């Protein structure tokens, strides 16, 4: 996940998901498996214009919005594979690889 001081809510939610998933998996095993999904641009939020949302997903390497069915498929994958625990799967069209935050745009990274 891309840690960035420009989007605190994103950074806190993704690192929180990651840490909660890992520590819960350690704490609850072997009886309970814990995995997480870190989605990218899937659904436009209430404060976002359609134009801004489109700009967001077009800035990903795959240049596409995440389909909700892909997230459902990931849940199904985790359910069907009993040897997986403590993993977070980024279904984000590659957003976490090169999210175009100001530090990237200005060439600071």
Please tell me what each predicted stretch does.
Residues 1-16, 21-29, 41, 95:
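Catalytic loop of short-chain dehydrogenase/reductase
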Residues 5, 13, 35, 63-64:
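Short alpha-helix in the Rossmann-fold core of NAD(P)-dependent oxidoreductases
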Residues 29-33, 84-87:
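Short, small/polar-rich loop/turn modules that mediate ligand/substrate recognition or access, typified
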Residues 36, 65, 88-90:
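Conserved beta-strand scaffold positions in the cores of enzyme catalytic domains, especially
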Residues 36-60, 100-109:
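A glycine/serine/threonine-rich, flexible loop-to-helix segment
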Residues 60-71:
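A conserved structural motif in NAD(P)-dependent oxidoreductases
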Residues 69-91, 96, 102:
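C-terminal substrate-recognition "lid" of short-chain dehydrogenase/reductases
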